[in-house]
Curated annotation (Swiss-Prot):
Record keywords: Aminoacyl-tRNA synthetase, ATP-binding, Cytoplasm, Ligase, Nucleotide-binding, Protein biosynthesis
Any one Gene Ontology molecular-function term assigned to this protein's record: ATP binding
Taxonomic source organism: Synechococcus sp. (strain ATCC 27144 / PCC 6301 / SAUG 1402/1)
Descriptive protein name: Proline--tRNA ligase
PANTHER family referenced in this protein's UniProt entry, alphabetically: MITOCHONDRIAL RIBOSOME PROTEIN L39/PROLYL-TRNA LIGASE FAMILY MEMBER (PTHR42753), PROLINE--TRNA LIGASE (PTHR42753:SF2)
Entry keyword annotation includes Cytoplasm: yes
Length: 600
């Protein structure tokens, strides 16, 4: 491709809208153009990158026996109502674009396709003889993000590969899940990316097990906790660990003490000369279910720990049926205004105890009149602890569960921390890294098939629900994440496997007929050898061309400059900036060798 004929415009300054390096560089280098908040045009260079990522994904999916298909982007609300997710996606979280057609039928623009594919399977899969099946698509998805940001990382429109598998039993599901795990590892390796596979929360997708694939980058939105022995890695939302050992309490007698002005853990510990590990603090939450009911929640947790709200949301979802609901649509720490709406009197915040009376809740038909009381294991195991006395400026010391307070249900709700000991080996401690979630695989189990009546006839003639898995990769996110992982002050450094072009031939002086002729010959030879090559034949200064070549990140640059007089050209490797002068006749072989060495 001749650069003089390409729609190619670069920017010298970082766009004001861009926050992270990869977003700045993709805009500056002419890969993408913002159309509206979270909506981008993929320009010719970017589309080539996306096609390459998609092709690698296709090859690895096809190698597992998965079959490519294409599902509708417009999805009827009835399917989502069958699964119970319409309220969550279209209203509670509000991430699904929804609309009414001219017959006033509700539709959604697909952020994901579990419901549609389950409906297809329900109609077409009849017998165990048809199983297993694994179908995938590469398609544009839509999410009405509250705050679109970071370019293609969190947009309202994005390209994704999503696959869905159907099975006769759980063992078959596990086998496909393992095959997808390996396929994803192959994909990210072939794309030239550094990544970690980590345990993850299943979120609104649901299911019994899930794993994320994180592309390592300092600007990643997700925190990963891992051990150096390579045996454990998890998203911080899911991570578990052994917390620091609690210091033995010096308070051996239960008594109420005046503790003026100690409504924080720090001030309380300073006043009592105690350690935060000796304190049980109460954290107040309120949850709203999809039936409109508000549930007050009282969490007891050790003073040096914090509540993981993802874990709490999952626990509330498991208990939703106890309150006549299906799911949680909001979870918040109530502020003063929120508390006024459901408390009978002002609460002694900062001094709450585990036995805060249910009578503190105002009588209201929309409010559940009893606290859900949960205790984290870090607090449940403490003895002779310090906690609030439910009275401003007062705490109790030397407290014990069952003796002084009923012990609530024990549930792991703490956020794992850097430096915590690993559960699999207490000599290993958790370290932290930032990552960009680029892939996610789930064992869905029977969640959707049971809800939507997708069954098959077993070998014994009985009707059973289909076992399901789903497997997603953000194709457009992978492309930008590659930039976030590999760039320098001059621009993008594309992995060779997904670079839009593998080589660029630069003519420093377009009026020099010798340079032009040599460049044309090298360009033709590289192209004939199957090397994807750009020819920078623009009427621009050499410095502009060199800067643009670095900015757009083409792996290998060939310059037909002064060395032509000796029958040689300069070749520059973008990643290392290593420059060498070689014979014109050696260019094709040299570039071929570099490409072969770089592509896994």
């Amino acid at each position: 491709m001749r650069l003089s004929q390409m729609l190619f415009v670069t920017l010298r300054e970082d766009p004001a809208e861009a926050e992270i390096p990869s977003h700045k560089l993709l805009l500056r280098a002419g890969y993408i153009r913002r159309i509206a908040s979270g909506i981008y045009a993929y320009l010719p260079l970017m589309w080539r990158v996306l096609r390459k990522v998609s092709q690698i994904v296709r090859e690895e999916m096809d190698a597992t026996g998965a079959q490519e298909t294409l599902l509708p982007q417009l999805q009827p609300a009835e399917l989502w109502q069958e699964s119970g997710r319409w309220e969550t996606y279209a209203k509670a979280e509000g991430i699904m674009f929804s609309l009414d057609d001219r017959q006033q039928r509700q539709l959604g623009l697909g952020p994901t396709h579990e419901e549609v594919i389950t409906a297809v399977a329900r109609d077409l899969i009849r017998s165990y003889r048809q199983l297993p099946q694994n179908l995938y698509q590469i398609q544009t998805k839509f999410r009405d993000e509250i705050r679109p940001r970071f370019g293609l990382m969190r947009g309202r429109e994005f390209i994704m590969k999503d696959a869905y598998s159907f099975h006769a039993d759980e063992e078959s599901l596990r086998q496909t899940y393992a095959a997808m795990d390996q396929a994803y590892r192959n994909i990210f390796r072939r794309c030239g990316l550094q990544f970690r596979a980590v345990e993850a929360d299943s979120g609104a997708i649901g299911g019994s097990a899930s794993q994320e694939f994180m592309i390592l980058a300092d600007a990643g939105e997700d925190e990963i906790l891992y051990t150096e022995d390579g045996r454990y890695a998890a998203n911080v939302e899911k991570a578990v660990s052994l917390p620091a050992e609690a210091i033995a309490s010096a308070f051996t007698t239960f008594e109420k003490r005046e503790t003026p002005g100690t409504d924080t853990i720090a001030s309380l510990c300073e006043f009592l000369k105690a350690d935060p590990t000796q304190v049980v603090k109460q954290v107040l939450y309120q949850a709203v279910f999809d039936n409109g009911k508000l549930l007050p929640i009282l969490i007891s947790i050790r003073g040096d720990q914090s509540v993981n709200e993802i874990k709490l949301t999952n626990e509330l979802t498991r208990r939703a049926a106890d309150y006549g609901a299906k799911t949680v649509i909001a979870l918040t720490v109530p502020d003063a205004e929120a508390l006024k709406k459901w408390t009978a009197a002002p609460l002694p915040l900062g001094y709450l105890g585990p036995d805060l009376a249910d009578s503190a809740i105002a009588v209201n038909e929309s409010i559940i009149p009893k606290f859900l009381r949960l205790v984290d294991p870090t607090a449940a195991e403490l003895q002779n602890f310090v906690t609030g006395a439910n009275e401003v400026n007062f705490h109790v010391v030397g407290a014990n569960w069952e003796t002084n307070f009923p012990k609530p249900a024990v549930v792991d709700l703490r956020t794992a921390l850097v430096g915590d000991r690993a559960q699999h080996d207490s000599s290993q401690v958790l370290a932290s890294a930032r990552g960009i979630e680029a892939g996610h695989i789930f064992q869905l189990g029977l969640k959707y098939s049971q809800a939507m009546g997708a069954t098959f006839t077993t070998e014994n003639g009985t009707e059973e629900p289909l076992w399901m898995g789903c497997y997603g990769i953000g194709v457009s996110r992978v492309a930008q994440a590659a930039v976030e992982q590999s760039y320098d002050k001059d621009g993008i450094i594309w992995p060779v496997a997904i670079a839009p072009y593998q080589a660029v031939v630069v003519i420093p002086n377009i009026t020099d007929t010798e340079q032009v002729a040599a460049a044309e010959k090298i360009y033709a030879d590289l192209t004939a050898a199957g090397i994807e090559t750009l020819l920078d034949d623009r009427d621009e200064r050499a410095g502009v061309k060199f800067k643009d070549a670095d900015l757009i990140g083409i792996p290998y640059r060939i310059v037909t400059g002064r060395s032509l007089k000796e029958g040689k050209v300069e070749v520059v490797q973008r990643a290392s900036k290593e420059s060498s002068v070689i014979a014109v006749g050696s260019v094709v072989e040299t570039v071929q060798d570099w490409i072969a060495a770089a592509i896994v």
